[in-house]
Amino acid sequence: MKEILIVFIYVLGIAKASAQLRDHQHVVEDDSLRGEAIAQTHPVAVDDSFALVPASLQYGNPSFFKRLFLGKNYREEWSIPVRTRIFDINNTLGGLTITESGGGKQTHSVTLKDKTGKEWKLRTVDKDPTKVLPANLQIPVALDIVQDMISAAHPYAPLTVPAIALAADIPHSEPGFYFVPDDPVLGEYRRLLANKVMILETKDATPDNSESRNSEKLMENIMEDNDHRIDQQSLLKARLLDILIADWDRHIDQWRWGVIDTGKGRIYYPIPVDRDQAFFYSDGLAMKFATMRKLPFMKGLRYSIKKINWLGFSARNFDRMFLNELDETTWKTTIGNFTNAVTDEVITEAVGQLPPEIFPVHGPEITAKLRSRRNELSKAGMAYYKFLSKRVNIFGTNEQEHFIVSAGNGRTKVKVLGSDKSGMPFTIYSRSFDPGETKEIRLFGFKGNDVFKVHKSANDIKLRVVGGEGTDSFFFNADKRVYLYDGTAEASYLTGTNPKNRSSRYPHFTRYRPDDIDYQYNQAFPLINIGFNTEDGLLAGVGFRQHTHSFDKQPFASENRLTTLYSFLGKAYQIRYAGVFTDVIGKLDLIAAAELQAPALANFFGLGNETKRSPNTDMYFYRARYKYLQTDAALKYDVTKTFSVSLGPSFYHYWNNHSDNSKRILGRPELVGLDSSNIYSTKTYAGGRLNLAVNSINNETFPTRGMLWSNDLLHLSGLTHNSRPLARAQSDLTIYKDLYRSKVIGVLRLGGGHIFSDRFEYFQAMTLGANTNLRGYRKTRFAGSSSAYNNLELRVKVADIRSYLFPGTLGVIGFNDVGNVWMRNETSDTWHHSYGGGLYYLPFNIFILSATAGISPEETLFNISLGTKINLIF
């Protein structure tokens, strides 16, 4: 998620900086200067009971660039003074007493009690989004941008919701807007509340004024007693209202729950609270760009309902817990009743609740959008039903339940039974599944001695049975698409057809509560690499990284990376693919890689440790421009969290054209002991690769401690008549050591390799050079049958730069490299040395900008990189 935020904030940051430069605004460089004043406002007129006051003073008078990139949004609504009641703690509602303070990540709130004992909530309309950003983004540009994006939320939207909720028979509060003056009577809460426009509403918005529960209490109750249930149809109505008004922020803490005692159990009905994101909309270019793929759930209030699956992203786990029993017919009926109830007149009345000063700005437009969305709700709602129905979670409780799975008429039926104190069974859950809609059903028993009976499941529906804690019993007479997960240390009983048993001694997912189970969406992220070095010139490339998710596969089911890189000087390109597929066979991961270079930008000076480079010959002459395609696949087993073993096939294809090398060293191969007929013939190899790897570094981008150790054994057989077999071993060890409080980092690298084959091709040789292991020398400067190298590097943090656009860490690098290659029948004790240094910069501590120079007896070489690693080369 950090990558998403950084791309979004960087795009917005450029606009913000441009706006400030244009307006000559002062940039706050100290976070401590922010805080309590950020949400204050001041009235333009006051009488005994009312103040003419804007909701906020932060979002008005935007520059052209701010409007263009960050949007006009609802800035006028925030800035227009509105006749607002004045809050007087001694007189409002007959007098109130503050009992506690609270609030979410962005709002400040207090709980109050009136003289009858009824509780009320008073919370800010404006917000402080500081806490929503991770620590590395707690910098001025990010704080200013995220603060400014509050203008995309309509400050008075909560006033419009009750009329729609009333028409649709959804419990709701009646919010009132108040201006809280700087009143000494507020005591210790004065600093928190003074000079703010706030919303006052009842804490328990139940129709009968009975006490409601928060979601945490609800989860405790429904887990401990299986006769406590959710009114799912009422919840669906409330979620349809969320979709209608584009309220995307509907996670589990945005709800309270009323209770109906039936005499045989309790039914909890939902009460939506905190309608702060209703009508959310930004027309800025930055938000439009971000919502294309990165933040699609924030598309906001448009005439059409876009990407309904993503609109429910914040409620992805919530919906899978509490909308899992409703079938297609119930959805259609509920949606139909909802759209019929929310008439044009209801929408007009609802939007008409906006203050008269505010309505003319966007009121007519909001009315038109709501009517249009209402008309699309049947289609969008059923699309969301199908999305939720693809994979369905069915939960038990901490008591004993009987899960019964059967089939008939091409459908799979799941029933969950509990029992009362007399032992009489009652139905907790019942639903029939269509294999055309549902691909996977997951049963979670949690605690209790649960019983699972699987008579038969529809062939196209995968069934996962998660026993949980307790002595569970399993009776299976099913096809092969049943997977069992239970603790092997627990006494469980299994009879009948054996399922695919995924039980383990430490089944972490069997001990969760339903709200602990996180459903992740598949996502793709853009990648970019930009660099410069003396040999390759300007390098630029783009790509993407994709994550897919599946049951109990952490941190993802698959990761796919596809990157490209182009050398403008060498007129060459490369395409790289890397894939990881988690637990494809038991706990074995599948890893795959492929690389195409056309041509490779390698050098060749001959074989041996003391090959000469003519001072009168241009480097162009030593370029070896051949092409190759390499692919690898392997099964990887993680022996520990830091040690892995992988084994699999490898393929290599080489081809070369004389026309690409006519004026280069490969155009005169006899100078370096090569045969022209051999170097221009196509060669294909296939074989296997064994890799042993240790990875204990603490950060992939900029490690400060840990170890990377890769040991690689490769054997290839020739598939063409002139392709010789190759056997090669390589080892590379890098140790990162924090020498002083993460400010001084020592890096030690040792490595080398050996070719066991008697003969090998020039492009297969062990090499030293460039930025790989001997900086200051050209790429692949030395080539032989064996190699050894040592790199010693010191990275010293110089300062934390509090730049507005690119705050980050600035440091210096110093290094010394030494290496040697050997050839059979050659005697050489020469070790090649180089040294150098440079600067690195870590904006947001997420990616690296580096500039280094390597100095050798032959020349000085420069490298500038922007990406995820120091030293980008082709």
Annotate each PLM feature.
Residues 26-29, 150-151, 259-430, 435-442, ...:
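C-terminal catalytic region of ATP-dependent kinase domains
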Residues 85-216, 246-247, 267-309, 313, ...:
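Conserved ATP-binding subdomain of kinase catalytic cores across diverse folds
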Residues 283, 455, 466, 472-590, ...:
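Outer-membrane beta-barrel initiation region
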Residues 467, 530-532, 546-548, 566, ...:
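Residue-level signature of outer-membrane beta-barrel architecture
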Residues 519, 576, 605, 615-622, ...:
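C-terminal outer-membrane beta-barrel translocator/porin domains of Gram-negative envelope proteins
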Residues 528-532, 560-566, 590-609, 647-653, ...:
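Transmembrane beta-barrel strands of outer-membrane/channel proteins
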Residues 555-557, 574-577, 602-610, 657-666, ...:
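Outer-membrane beta-barrel translocator domains and adjoining extracellular loop/strand segments
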Residues 689-690, 860-874:
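Outer-membrane beta-barrel "beta-signal"
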